[in-house]
Amino acid sequence: PNVKMKDSGVEWIGEVPEKWEAVKISHIGKLTKANGGSKQDNVDSGISCIRYGDLYTTHEYIIRKSRSYIEEGKLDEYTAIQYGDALFAASGETFEDIGRSAVNLLKEDACCGGDVIVLKPSKDIDPLFLGYALDSIPSKYQKALMGRGYTVVHIYTEQLRDLIVAVPPSFEQKTIGIALDRQTARIDLIIEKTQRSIDLLRERRSALITAAVTGQIDLRETI
């Protein structure tokens, strides 16, 4: 960037613009361990419920739509979440993936299941920016170092408090969040179209092999 830079003081973040600050997430919000029941509580519709497994399979950076729901009568057994809250998966299979996170942008009532750590950020933190910052490469590197365990990897609130992110002024957070949202959406669309082309080419490849080895086409003249 064409701005004056400074050393963040954090090796894996490097230099940041002069007006940015590298801070522990415990300084920008409150972290708590969530409580919640099992997947057996899931129903087809009801209160949106984000489970730790959803953070690995469904939600990348941002939670825009729930895939799990519970009955309203079960809500007291779960941890309520609000718009802008960040959710971290507290357990996983690998150090590289531990602490996978996403920020809740659901505007309706919602909750989360167990094995989730919730960050309730201060009001001057933009949700979109936070979502991308918490699961960026520097953040993933730190979370991997914080992981504990072997067969199952865990990350705990006490370690996660020390996760450091680079935070710009509020107006820059909003601008960066919106820009990232638009540009990543374009990239995702290109990836989707490319994947469809790859899938089609694989189908044609398989069909060619099948036709050739069953005598349906003669490839001798192509040699």
Predicted segments with their positions:
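Amphipathic alpha-helical coiled-coil/heptad-repeat segments
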Residues: 1-4, 167-223
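Non-catalytic DNA-recognition/assembly elements of restriction-modification systems
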Residues: 4-35, 162, 166-170, 174, ...
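Short coil/turn segments at secondary-structure boundaries
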Residues: 5-7, 38-45, 65, 145-147
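A short glycine-rich beta-alpha junction/loop motif
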Residues: 8, 109-117, 148-175
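Sequence-specific dsDNA recognition surfaces
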Residues: 26-39, 53-86
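A short beta-sheet element
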Residues: 51, 73-137, 149, 156
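Short, small-residue-rich loop/turn micro-motifs
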Residues: 52-56, 105, 180, 223
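Periplasmic-binding protein-like
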Residues: 139-142
